[in-house]
């Protein structure tokens, strides 16, 4: 709780004093690092491995139990090394399971990515890119009232922004 938060803030202060800038929620980089530049310019991305400057929507997993991301969803290779080897020898691939993205998954994924990378998200803008009606999402943002009352976020005209230091 509070002790862990205080530790994180002490570490952040030390890193910032040493010339690092905060990237997203849990990374730091030197001001001239490509991640820091991407964060400042609004082109930072995040995948399940962390923050990145790479906008590619494909991430290929190699080896037993690896997870990959393709435009249509996630795939995971066989977990056990013997099953992985047998599958590769037999079929050339060891994909053991997959999860296909729905349009809603893609929409929610971009919303989460923007919040994690930019600390703000423009719901109407993202909905327009996904040919989705923003009305329900904007209405659901009213459920964030407690966070807004606590000064952690602001919600204005469909834009949700995390307050600095929240």
PLM features: residue spans?
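C-terminal scaffold of the Radical SAM
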Residues: 1-132
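Residue-level detector of family-conserved "landmark" positions at structurally sensitive sites
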Residues: 23-25, 137, 157-158
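Short secondary-structure capping/turn micro-motifs that flank functional sites
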Residues: 29-32, 143, 164
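Intrinsically disordered, low-complexity regions
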Residues: 43, 144-146, 159
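Short amphipathic alpha-helical interaction segments
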Residues: 133-149
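A short, conserved structural fragment
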Residues: 148-158
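Accessory beta->alpha helical hairpin/"wing" motif in late/C-terminal subdomains of nucleic-acid enzymes
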Residues: 156-166
């Amino acid at each position: 709780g509070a002790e862990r938060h205080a530790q994180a803030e002490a570490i952040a202060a030390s890193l910032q004093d040493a010339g690092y800038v905060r990237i997203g929620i849990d990374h730091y980089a030197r001001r001239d690092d490509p991640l820091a530049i991407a964060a400042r310019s609004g082109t930072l991305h995040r995948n399940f491995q962390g923050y990145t400057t790479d906008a590619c929507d494909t991430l290929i997993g190699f080896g037993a139990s690896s997870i990959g991301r393709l435009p249509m969803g996630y795939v995971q290779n066989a977990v056990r090394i013997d099953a992985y080897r047998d599958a590769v020898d037999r079929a050339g691939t060891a994909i053991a399971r997959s999860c296909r993205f729905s349009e809603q998954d893609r929409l929610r994924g971009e919303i989460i990515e923007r919040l994690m990378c930019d600390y703000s998200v423009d719901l109407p803008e993202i909905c327009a890119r996904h040919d989705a009606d923003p009305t329900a999402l904007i209405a659901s943002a009213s459920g964030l009232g407690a966070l807004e009352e606590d000064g952690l976020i602001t919600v204005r005209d469909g834009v949700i922004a995390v307050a600095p230091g929240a």
